[in-house]
A protein has these predicted regions:
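Bacterial N-terminal signal peptides
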Residues: 3-14
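Alpha/beta-hydrolase superfamily serine-hydrolase fold, recognizing
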Residues: 17-293
């Protein structure tokens, strides 16, 4: 076994040397809420070449169960999107352990306010934003693209969005996921978690409903087109993706739920930007359509 260690070490070094270096932000740790709280900062990645005309902006919200995650955990996405000529913004938000859900919504709205006001400095178009996120960040992205109230508090409107791409979230319809998760746990003989969706979303049924993106879907208020990505083999996210798709399409809003095969909750996110990745192909097709309008 010892004789293999030098070979394994050499392989690891070679692999690390071949792996692309993460793209450095054009501007890092930008405060967006007038505070010194690191959780209320964002990173901006500008396109390598100055665009001939204002570029679309990809606004990304990290996952982490609303109580973890970091704006730097973006894998391939900054390089992938800036190579396409887009501006890429990745935001932090305060955690649910210190901040209620409605104030997390407000954090994202403030971050969008900063992005809208400063996008042009990086070659971006403040009125051509596509909001995206993974897991809990996907729930936040969908909510901000559907319920206009957090944006309105910042003097913004849904018209700033050209599209929304939530990636593998299970909380677009909070009462429904609580019901399904409870049934799954009972069937498996598992206890309820001490700090689950009930607690994260305010502990009251009326808040579970209000914090659900599906509750606020309505025609005629400017909700952008949606591409809803999910792991086709997951326990909860397929049902939630289809619920959101159905809520949108029944109101005449463009939406497509795409279930990726042979993936996981983490992989569907980290693979975004890889050649021949099915979810990436869907994203590129979606962007081509919505940004042409």
């Amino acid at each position: 076994m010892r004789s293999l260690l030098p070979l394994l070490a050499a392989f690891s070094l070679a692999y690390a040397a071949d792996a692309p270096a993460p793209l450095a932000p054009t501007k890092a740790d930008v405060p967006y809420a007038g505070t010194s709280d690191f959780r209320q900062t964002l990173n901006v990645y500008g396109p390598a070449a100055k665009p001939a005309k204002p570029a679309p902006v990809i606004f990304w919200i990290h996952g982490g169960g609303w109580r973890g995650g970091e704006k730097t955990t973006v894998q391939l996405k900054p390089k992938f999107f800036t190579d396409l000529g887009y501006v890429f913004v990745s935001t932090n938000h305060r955690y649910i352990t210190t901040t209620p859900m409605n104030e997390i919504f407000a954090d994202i709205a403030k971050s969008l306010r900063w992005t809208h006001d400063h996008a042009a400095e990086f070659g971006g178009d403040p009125n051509r934003i596509v909001i995206m996120g993974h897991s809990s960040g996907a729930q936040l992205a969908a909510y901000l693209a559907i319920d206009e109230r957090p944006l309105k508090a910042e003097g913004l409107s849904l018209s700033m969005f050209k599209g929304c791409v939530p990636v593998d979230a299970d909380t677009f319809d909070v009462p429904a996921v609580i019901e399904l998760a409870t049934a799954n746990r009972k069937a498996a003989g598992k206890p309820e978690p001490k700090y689950g969706h009930r607690e994260i979303f305010g502990g009251k049924p009326e808040l579970w409903t209000d914090y659900s993106a599906t509750t606020h879907v309505a025609a005629g208020k400017g909700i952008p087109p949606f591409l809803i990505l999910y792991d086709a083999a997951a326990a909860l996210t397929p049902d939630q993706a289809k619920r959101l798709e159905r809520a949108l399409t029944t109101k005449g809003i463009q939406a497509k739920a795409f279930g990726a095969a042979n993936t996981t909750h983490g992989k569907i996110n980290s693979d975004l930007g890889l050649p021949n990745d099915p979810s990436t192909t869907e994203v590129l097709s979606f962007l081509k359509t919505v940004l042409a309008k």
